[in-house]
């Protein structure tokens, strides 16, 4: 979202006077005279009634009024501005419809970008900014990822408690429209807990697991098991279910669902979607150790009919998690490569061996090219002497 700098060609006193008169004219309970207590008291009074303009004003006119208020707010010293900023943010969450919500969103974004980057008030503004963005379906305009979020607060990082609160909000506003982003947010949230307080993160850990399992684009689930809050769930059904998605095959999930159908449904998980994901994960695991698989093997392991094998493999190839070739004539699937479901010590050793082999091959190629080059130079010198 773009934001224009705040600039009003009036003195603070003149702006305050005009704003008081404007809101008084709209019927707000506010005096048209300036406060003798100073501009901060004026702002408190103006912000207290500023939502009056939401009733009848045009969005463009309201935007100008809010811009004027913001231009005054950013002149208030940090130590005296917190209550004013918080009051304004609360008012911006009260927009009665989407068009005005977008105006309020723009105003908060303007305030956020005009505050000093080292100001702790930016956190509070951003939190309300996300709330308003949700109301007018503009979340991705203000939040595109965790890295972008950390960059915005680099000069004044919020406390762990503040970030936990913000991550929970971001999860809530993205879970219905961008499950992959929502899942990343929850993983980041769990990463804010330490060994000392991980035991209190039970609800967050469960949400994180459910979000990751439900996300059709999240397949590498092994890292979740290393998160401290998730470790505290060991022995719980949700942890057992996660472990199945991390390393077990389809039959294990089918058995779990038969034994705990009510639990799975209570978590908001869709059984058919779980089956679809477990089939893909099972295929990946089979591909790790089988360079080729028969259709018969796949029908048995994936619990599908032979007619469903080809469409299934095509869907797998679209994910780019596995590289393979269908051999319809011989009813086989030839595997070129696959992403590993888990990445532990064995996978690191395999990667090391592969890189070492590449290094040795490159050394051989280099030595060969050096020998060829030397031979050509020697031949050129010999021919020169002859002539």
Curated annotation (Swiss-Prot):
Subcellular location: Cytoplasm; Golgi apparatus
Pfam families hit by this protein: eIF3m_C_helix (PF18005), PCI (PF01399)
UniProt keywords, alphabetically: Cytoplasm, Golgi apparatus, Initiation factor, Protein biosynthesis
GO molecular function terms noted in the UniProt entry: translation initiation factor activity
The keyword Protein biosynthesis is annotated on this UniProt entry: yes
GO biological process: formation of cytoplasmic translation initiation complex; protein secretion
One cellular component term from this protein's GO annotations in UniProt: Golgi apparatus
Chief subcellular location: cytoplasm
Recorded superkingdom: Eukaryota
Database matches in SUPFAM superfamilies: ARM repeat, Winged helix' DNA-binding domain
InterPro entries assigned: ARM-type_fold (IPR016024), COPS7/eIF3m (IPR045237), eIF3m (IPR027528), eIF3m_C_helix (IPR040750), PCI_dom (IPR000717), WH_DNA-bd_sf (IPR036390)
Family: Belongs to the eIF-3 subunit M family.
Subunit note: Component of the eukaryotic translation initiation factor 3 (eIF-3) complex. The eIF-3 complex interacts with pix.
Purpose of the protein: Component of the eukaryotic translation initiation factor 3 (eIF-3) complex, which is involved in protein synthesis of a specialized repertoire of mRNAs and, together with other initiation factors, stimulates binding of mRNA and methionyl-tRNAi to the 40S ribosome. The eIF-3 complex specifically targets and initiates translation of a subset of mRNAs involved in cell proliferation.
HAMAP family assigned: eIF3m (MF_03012)
Protein name: Eukaryotic translation initiation factor 3 subunit M
Organism: Drosophila pseudoobscura pseudoobscura (Fruit fly)
